[in-house]
Amino acid sequence: MWRELILQMYPEADLNDPADEVTLAEVEKHLMLPLPFELASLLRETDGVSNEYGDAVVWSARRLVEDNLAMRREPDYLELYAPFDEMIFFGDSDMGPQFAYVHTDYGPGIVVWDHESDRRRLVVVSLRDYLARCFIQGNAWFR
């Protein structure tokens, strides 16, 4: 479903081989958070998605672990920013901001995080909407 949806919206998208169940379980183990259902579902079909310019719209399972743990452990980040422990960063824009899942009272939501201000703003509530905005509206859609 995800591969077809992505290629329908953005034929130039670069899709990877799927992530396996062992890999997804390792992501949850390392991050100590469950993967949102729709993100896990996408990763089961393609382990990451890039646009034609190489921007990682959705990170691979490996990058999910590496980047999230690095952000949580970076001493400077611990002083400068509110904690990231309840967030799962999963994508970025060539303009600097990164996107993360957070849990809201209504379920998971996707926020954009601005590293300059530590502002975290809910931008969409579904991965489908996030992908549509990234691929159809371009890199500045979240502004």
Regions found by a protein language model. Give the residues of each.
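Short conserved micro-motifs at the rims of enzyme active sites and ligand-binding pockets
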Residues: 100-103, 122-124
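Compact, glycine/acidic-enriched structural inserts
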Residues: 117-142
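Short, flexible beta-strand-to-coil junctions
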Residues: 91-95, 104-105, 115-117
